[in-house]
Amino acid sequence: MVQVVCGLIEDGGRLLACRRPPGKHLGGLWEFPGGKVEPGESPEAALIRELQEELGIETEITGALSPVEWDYGRGPIRLIPFFCRIVTGTPHPHEHDELEWVDAATCARLTWAAADGPILAEWKAGDVATSRTPTP
């Protein structure tokens, strides 16, 4: 099973949503930024690397949510979501065609990649408080 990470980048009660470009697998759907874990890499290190590559930002992980197993027809994935915050930089889409900061109400109008659905539901339900790690 392919290990994939994603980051719920928080800013004032909003999360950063990224739209996959047309012509790419799942093109036009919204997702949380991230990518595949490389061999020998921890999920946390993979997320920090992917967010720097995809958005040009340095981040810090502040918590975790429940992993999601999904199959888009190309083999199963295990999507490992983390909460994080921006340490330096401003997000710019290097691999997506649009970025949008969304709150719980506005994220409902976006069409999300299916594996992100359970993550969104957990975030909206507020069931993540016990999963958060304290920030210094």
Where do the language-model regions lie?
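Active-site-adjacent beta-strand/loop module that shapes the phosphate/pyrophosphate-binding cleft
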Residues: 58, 67-90, 100
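NUDIX/MutT-family hydrolases
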Residues: 83, 92-124
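A conserved beta-turn-beta hairpin within the catalytic core of GNAT-like acetyltransferases
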Residues: 24-29, 101
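The catalytic Nudix box helix
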Residues: 32-64, 103
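Conserved N-terminal beta-strand and adjoining loop/helix that marks the start
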Residues: 1-15, 36
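Conserved hydrophobic "DFG−1" position in protein kinase catalytic cores
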Residues: 9-10, 17, 84-86, 101
